[in-house]
Curated annotation (Swiss-Prot):
Organism: Xanthomonas oryzae pv. oryzae (strain KACC10331 / KXO85)
Protein name: Type II methyltransferase M.XorII
Family: Belongs to the class I-like SAM-binding methyltransferase superfamily. C5-methyltransferase family.
PROSITE patterns assigned to the protein according to its UniProt record, in alphabetical order: C5_MTASE_1 (PS00094), C5_MTASE_2 (PS00095), SAM_MT_C5 (PS51679)
Enzyme class: transferase
One record GO biological process: DNA restriction-modification system
Comp. bias (Basic and acidic residues): 406-424
InterPro entries noted in UniProt: C5-Methyltransferase, C5_DNA_meth_AS, C5_MeTfrase, C5_meth_CS, SAM-dependent_MTases_sf
Keyword Glycoprotein belongs to the record: no
Region annotated Disordered, chain positions: 404-424
One Gene Ontology molecular-function label: DNA (cytosine-5-)-methyltransferase activity
Length: 424
């Protein structure tokens, strides 16, 4: 079986990668500048070449060589390039140095000459002065030999089975002469209760003050949760199966709250915002607010604001956030809360990516097939690796990502020990 192939630029931990794999593609290379993200991608995608580099410094020929695909036609290039600024009057926004990552995304697409591309970004690119920048991006693709779906859309992941309000611009294009893809039709909604209702309360396990995993007995899953736990076959998932223990609860390192915080969390009604912390309390029959990545190093490197659990007076865990983002339970994130939430908050929900990938598959006129091969996940050390060790492993500087000015969270000390309390 020969599956269509793709390359993910700005891959992060792999939300787009996973969604397109589930749509029937083989991701042959993934590029990201962050060694921690690259380590997670390497762990979760053992068949994909991980390239820890800025897209500014990579070429199409280099990616072909690393991926081992020679001159084979690439079916899809995907990616969400950050854009930091907009130009003064009289200067093209795409030429602005602050937007060089978008410029180089376009460049690498031109060098690789895939049949299709998908450019994902914030919905803000579609409003006000930002639309001029988006127009320049579209023109750059058109001048490079691509037709673009100019009636671009902002898609809400909640319309594609993700229990989260998350709106993203999806821009799609095809090499001239190939049919343009259509946008996916909504597939229905999933609730918070569907997503996390079967997960046992992390605070029932003292081990989770020291590490992020434990063997646990789960409750009765919804269909959504059964798919993510691997307890039921999802007929729309054409990705590789992974070897993992479905009784393992991962990504569940606990957060210690003051008693006052717990009282406030318990008192607030579902779907309301707790006034002191400004955290939203989730409702079992609702959807989650947008999960974010937290602040950068130059802004204090704070962990992202996390919603309050709907039935327990605490914030949600990384695993609960992953469920709300449509990641399967075999998918692992960094063991620390800061990196784990950063990886989720920076990523495209796999179910949204799968819906888009399915439309590219239709445009290719190919029928997706489920591989029979089951993949072993990577070495466990990749999940707890430090930035210094991750950088050394990939042969890059440990300062390629600005250092966190606050210590990365470590396993929480026992309650009788001195600890940093979350009072927000």
């Amino acid at each position: 079986m020969t599956r269509p192939i793709g390359i993910d630029l700005f891959a992060g931990a792999g939300g787009l990668s996973l969604g397109f794999e589930q749509a029937g593609f083989d991701l042959v290379a993934a590029v990201d500048i962050d060694p921690i993200h690259c380590a997670a991608h390497k762990f979760n995608f053992p068949k994909c070449a991980t390239v820890c580099k800025s897209v500014v410094d990579v070429t199409g020929d280099e990616l072909r060589r690393i991926a081992g695909i020679g001159k084979r036609d690439i079916d899809i290039v995907i990616g969400g390039a950050p854009c930091q600024g907009f130009s003064l009057i009289g200067k093209r926004a795409l030429d602005d140095s602050r937007n060089q990552l978008v410029h180089h995304y376009v460049r690498v697409v031109m060098e690789l000459k895939p049949k299709y591309f998908v450019f994902e970004n914030v919905k803000g690119l579609t409003v006000g002065k930002h639309r001029q920048f988006l127009k320049e991006v579209i023109e750059a693709f058109q001048n490079g030999g691509y037709d673009v779906v100019t009636d671009y859309r902002v898609l809400n992941a909640a319309d594609y089975g993700v229990p989260q309000d998350r709106r993203r611009l999806i821009l799609m294009g095809a090499r001239k002469g190939l049919p343009l893809p259509a946008y996916p039709e909504p597939t229905g909604r999933t609730t918070v209760g569907d997503a996390i209702g079967d997960i046992p309360d992390a605070e029932s396990f003292p081990e989770l003050w020291e590490r992020d995993w434990v063997k646990a007995k789960y409750g009765k899953p919804s269909t959504y949760a059964a798919y993510l736990r691997g307890k039921k076959d999802d007929p729309t998932d054409f990705g590789y199966r992974r070897q993992f223990d479905p009784m393992l609860l991962t990504g569940s390192l606990l957060t210690d709250h003051t008693e006052l915080s717990r009282q406030r969390f318990a008192a607030i009604a579902p779907d309301d915002v707790e006034p002191v912390s400004r955290f939203k309390k989730l409702a079992l029959n609702g959807i989650c607010n947008t999960l974010r990545a937290g602040t950068a190093s130059d802004r204090g490197a704070f962990t992202s604001p996390r919603p309050i659990h709907p039935t327990v007076p605490r914030v949600i865990t990384v695993r609960e956030a992953a469920r709300l983002h449509s990641y399967p339970d075999w998918f692992r994130f960094h063991a620390t809360k800061w990196h784990g939430f950063r990886q989720i908050g920076n990523s495209v929900p796999p179910l949204l990516a799968r819906a888009v990938g399915g439309q590219i598959m239709k445009a290719l006129r190919k029928k997706p097939e489920k591989p029979s091969e089951m993949l072993a996940l990577g070495d466990q050390s990749l999940i707890g690796i430090s930035m210094t060790d991750a950088a050394a492993m990939f042969g890059v500087s440990s300062t390629v990502i600005a250092r966190r000015s606050r210590p990365v969270d470590r396993p929480a000390p026992r309650r009788h020990e001195e600890r940093e309390l979350v009072t927000a």
